[in-house]
Amino acid sequence: MEAGGLPLELWRMILAYLHLPDLGRCSLVCRAWYELILSLDSTRWRQLCLGCTECRHPNWPNQPDVEPESWREAFKQHYLASKTWTKNALDLESSICFSLFRRRRERRTLSVGPGREFDSLGSALAMASLYDRIVLFPGVYEEQGEIILKVPVEIVGQGKLGEVALLASIDQHCSTTRLCNLVFTPAWFSPIMYKTTSGHVQFDNCNFENGHIQVHGPGTCQVKFCTFKNTHIFLHNVPLCVLENCEFVGSENNSVTVEGHPSADKNWAYKYLLGLIKSSPTFLPTEDSDFLMSLDLESRDQAWSPKTCDIVIEGSQSPTSPASSSPKPGSKAGSQEAEVGSDGERVAQTPDSSDGGLSPSGEDEDEDQLMYRLSYQVQGPRPVLGGSFLGPPLPGASIQLPSCLVLNSLQQELQKDKEAMALANSVQGCLIRKCLFRDGKGGVFVCSHGRAKMEGNIFRNLTYAVRCIHNSKIIMLRNDIYRCRASGIFLRLEGGGLIAGNNIYHNAEAGVDIRKKSNPLILCNQIHHGLRSGIVVLGNGKGIIRNNQIFSNKEAGIYILYHGNPVVSGNHIFKGRAAGIAVNENGKGLITENVIRENQWGGVDIRRGGIPVLRSNLICFGYSDGVVVGDEGKGLIEGNTIYANKGCGVWMMSSSLPHVTSNHVSYNGLYGVAVFSQKDGSSELPRGHRAQENFSEDGDAILWETELEKEDDPLRRPITIALVESNSINHNGASGLYVQSSEALHVITNVIHANGDRGITVAQSSQPTRVANNSISCNRQSGVKVEAQCKVELRGNGIYDNRGHGIITKGDSTIVIENDIIGNRGSGLQLLPRSDTKVIKNRIHSFRAYGIAVRGRAKALVQENIIFQGKTSKTIFQQISNNRECIMQNNKFLVFKKKSDTWRLVNPPARPHLENSLRRPSAAHNGQKVTAMATRITARVEGGYHSNRSVFCTIL
C-alpha cells in the first residue's frame, strides 16, 4: 500500500463489503494489507461472527453483552471447531501408495424438504456417502422409526435456529457425525433423541427439548452453543466429552449425568478434543506475583523468663509500729483506706491500668515524703502478629489486618501445592465450561467413579448445582453457584476432587455439603450470604478447606458434626450471623491459622461431644465470645490469638474438660477466660429442630455411620481435669479469669495482666481450683479474689502491682503457699470474715497498705512467711479484732533500718518459676486424623452475663 493511496478509514469501509474468502486473499498481499485486515476486528469480523448460523455470540449464554477480546479470533475458533468431526477423513482412505494418484471424491450436498431432492431425512441418509452434507430446509421432520447412522455425515438446518425441527430417535453406528442448527424433540416411541456408543458426535447451535441424549464410552462428543430444555445428557464411561457455551433450562432431574470411570479405550477424536482443550484459554489465573507471607501465629516471643526481684528502700524511719495499731485519721494512708469497698476489696480510682515494667513509685505522695520503689520487671503480654495490630482497638476504626494475614490468590496457592496444580490442569471424563444451568432441579451429577471438570459456569435457581458421589472426582474452577434450593455442591460416599476459585452464595442450604468419607480440596472460594451454613462437614466427611473467604452466612461459616473431620486452615471467616465455626455432635477437625472475625455469635463454638484441635487462629472483633466450649464440648485450644471480642475471650464449661493452652487473650469486652459448670439447657432441642430434619437428604432419614476411629491422635494429650495453662490473658474488660464451677479446675503458668477488673475471680468452686505458677500483674482491682464457700489452692504465683489487694478471700478452704505477693496497692492479703485460709511460705509486700489484713473473725494459719514492710505509716500486719482463730507461727518481718537497705528475692528467685513448666504450641499436624451434623443454632440474648450462659449465645 503506497503512502499516497487512500486513507485507512476509506480502505476499511471498502473492505467491509468483502466476503470471507476475499478477506483471506487480501491478507496475503503484503504485511500492510494483513494488518489492515486485522484492523477490521470490531466491524467486518464482528459481522461475520454474529451472522454465522452455526454459532452464537462468543460469550453466550453467560455474558452476551461482553465483547470478546478479538472477534476474528472467536470466528476462527468457531470455524476450526466445526471441522473437528472430519479430522479422521484421511485415515479412512486407502493407505496404499496408489491412493496418492486417486482423484479425491468431492463431498455432496443432499437437500431435504418439500420440493427438494429428498422428502425425509431417512431417505437422504439411505443415499448418503462418507462425509456428505445433508441440508434440511425449514419445516418439521418426524421420523416414525429409529434412524441408524451408518456412515459419517453432516446434518445442517437451513435458515434461522428454530425453523427446522426434527422429531426422531437417532442411533449412531459410524465413527463421526455433526449436527447443526436443528431443534430436536423426541419421537413418539422413545425419549432418547440421540445415542452413540463408540463414535464421535458434534452438536453446534442446536436446541433439545424434553428428551435424553446418551453417549457411551469409548464414544465422545463435543457440544457447543446449544440449548437444553428439560433434557438430560447421560455420559457413561466417556473418555472425554466437551460441553461449551450451552444453556440448560428447566430440568426435571439432572441436566448432565457423568457415570463410570473414563474408558481406557479411546476413539480417534480423543486426541483432537484434548488438543482443542489445551489450546483454548484457561480459567486458571496466570498472574506472576510474589507469594504473600503465610499466616504464622506460632512465631511468638518467649512468654517470660526467670528474674531476680529487688526491693529497694529509700529513706529512713524507726522500726515497725505495733501490729494492732491503725493509721492516723488525717494521714494520706487513711484516705487510701477509704477506697476499700464494703467487702474489703480495694477499688482503684485511677482510670488506667499499669502496663509498665516498674511498680508504682508513690505517685500520689508529696515530693517531700519518702519514696519506695520496687525494681523488678512485671511480666506483660506476649507480642504476637508483629507490632501494633494487637494494641487497644479504636472505636469505629476500620479493621486493617497485617500483610501476613492477607489471603493468597488461587495462582499462589496452586504454585505452592503441586498436586493441586496438576489436578487443576488435568482433563478427564467430561469438561463443562462457560455453560448456564438454571431454573431446574439438578445441574451436574457425577457418580460411580465418574470424572468431570467444570470451568466458568453459572448454576442458578436449581435444587442443587453439583452432586458427586460413589468415589467420583470433580474439578470446579471459577463457577458461580447461587440461589439453589438445597446445597450448592454436595459430596458423599467418598467423593472428592478440587473446588477452587468459585463464587457460592445465596443458597438455601450449605454452600458445600461434605458427607460420608468424602474428601475434597476446597481452595480459594468465596462462600457467602447463605441462608444456612457456608460449609457443612458431617457423617465422617473429611476434606481440606483452605484459603477461602466465608462470610455473611446465616448460620455457622463452617459446621462440623457427626464425626466430620476436615482440615480447616488459612481461611477468612467473618461477618456471619451465627458462629464462625461450630463443632457439635462428635465433630472433630484440625482448625488452624484461620482469621475468624466479626461474627454475631462465638468465633468458634464447640458443644455436644465436639472435640476439635483449634490452633494458631486469630479470633477477633466478634460481637459475642471468642471461643465457646459448651455442654459436653471438648478439644484442644492452643496457640490462638483471641482479641477484641465484645463478650469473653473464652467461655467454657469445666465439665467438658477443655484444654486451653498457649493462647493470647486480650482486649475482650468481658472476661478473658470464663469457666462455668451449670447446665444451660442446651441439650434439649425444640420440637421441629431435630438434626435429622435439618440435614436430611431428599426427605429420607439419615443413618450415620457410628464407627469411630481409634483415639490415638497425637495432637491431643488426655486430660481428666479442665486445664487453662500457659496463656497470656491481658487487657480484658472484666476479670482475666472468672471461675464459677462445681468441677475441679487447674490454672497453670498463665500471664494474667492489666485486665479491667481482677486478675482471677473465683466466685464458685465446690471442687478444688488449683492456681499455680501464674504471673498476675497490673490488674485494675485485686490480683485474686476468692468468694465464700470456695476451695482454692494458690501455689507458686507471682502477684505483682495490682491496683487492689494482692489476694482477697472469703473462701472456707483457701491455701496460699509459696507465692510472691509484691507491690500491690492494697494489702498483700485481705482475709475477710468467716474465711478459712492457710498462708504458708509466701513473700509478701505492699507499698501503701498492710502485708496481711485480717478482717473480723477470719480463721487463718499464717506460717513461715517473709513479710516486707511497705509504706512507713503502715504496719506489716493488721488484725481488726482480737481473733484467737488467727494463728501466727515462724513468720519473718523485715523493716528497713537505713536508706541503703536492699532486699532481693533470690532464694528462690522471683516467682513464678516457669522454666520447666512452660509449654509451647505443638507443631502443626498436616495429616488428616481428625473425624463427621450439628443441631441448628439459635441465638438468645440473656438478660445478664452471670446467668452462667455464654453472652448472646446459646444452643437451643
Swiss-Prot record:
A single GO cellular-component term on record: cytosol
Skewed-composition ranges (Low complexity): 316-336, 351-361
GO terms for biological process, alphabetical: apoptotic process; protein ubiquitination; regulation of apoptotic process; ubiquitin-dependent protein catabolic process
PbH1 repeats: 198-217, 238-260, 427-448, 449-470, 471-493, 494-516, 538-560, 561-583, 584-606, 607-629, 630-652, 653-675, 717-739, 740-762, 764-786, 787-809, 832-854
Statement: the UniProt record of this protein carries the keyword Phosphoprotein: yes
A UniProt-annotated Pfam family: Beta_helix
Domain F-box as annotated: residue spans: 1-48
Ranges for region Disordered: 314-367
Highest taxon in the source lineage: Eukaryota
Compartment annotation: Cytoplasm
Pathway(s) of this molecule: Protein modification; protein ubiquitination
InterPro entries: Beta_helix (IPR039448), Carb-bd_sugar_hydrolysis-dom (IPR006633), F-box-like_dom_sf (IPR036047), F-box_dom (IPR001810), NosD_dom (IPR007742), Para_beta_helix_rpt-2 (IPR022441), PbH1 (IPR006626), Pectin_lyas_fold (IPR012334)
Modified residues annotated as Phosphoserine in this record: 321, 326
Effect of residue 825 to W: Found in a patient with lymphoma; partial loss of function in controlling the stability of BCL2
Pathological condition linked to this protein in its record: Defects in FBXO10 may be a cause of diffuse large B-cell lymphoma by allowing the accumulation of BCL2, an oncoprotein that has a critical role in lymphomas.
Annotated function: Substrate-recognition component of the SCF (SKP1-CUL1-F-box protein)-type E3 ubiquitin ligase complex. Mediates the ubiquitination and degradation of BCL2, an antiapoptotic protein, thereby playing a role in apoptosis by controlling the stability of BCL2. Targets also the receptor for advanced glycation end products RAGE for ubiquitination and subsequent lysosomal degradation. Directly controls HGAL/GCSAM ubiquitination and degradation and thereby decreases BCR signaling.
Complex formation: Component of the SCF(FBXO10) complex consisting of CUL1, SKP1 and FBXO10. Interacts with BCL2. Interacts with PRDM1.
Annotated protein name in UniProt: F-box only protein 10
Native source species: Homo sapiens (Human)
